[in-house]
Amino acid sequence: MAMPSSFSRGGFVFVRRIVTRPVDAELEDHDSMDPETFRQMDEAGRFALSWDAHNLRYALPLSVDTDLALGKTVVANVSRHVVAEARDKYPSCAVLLITAEISCRAERLVRRGRENPDQITARLARESAPVPPGVTPIIIDNSGLLAIGVTAFVMALRTIAAQE
């Protein structure tokens, strides 16, 4: 998803996740890493945040800490299961929960073609887990047109940045 040019010059940083999955530019712009290298780097503390999901390992690079120290607004895509850890490490972080109706999510996962039906069912069951207690996310319903979801996302980011 392309962001308006105002975000590139407005102090926003969109973090590229590190994932133990080959790069597929059509699905997600991420950095790929083999599982063993990932494990070694994780054990050495070379990630800002890491977690497991969907039989893969994910991480945010240490550059997150540098960007935050420079006063930038950092935007990262993480699992809701790592939100508590993120809030512990970054107490001022805001949580945006982007969701969609379950039928819409199922259709999108099937169309993406990365997972078999059993994996999709398990993923949908896992995604219904709530955010941790004490976290009040800004909820964005992405069930409709992409333009509507993007507009809601942009508005939420601008609101959060204005509060910093």
Predicted regions and their residues:
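Short, well-structured alpha-helical segments
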Residues: P117-S128
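Short glycine-/polar-rich loops that comprise or flank the Walker A/P-loop
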Residues: G10-F12, K89-A94, P133-T136
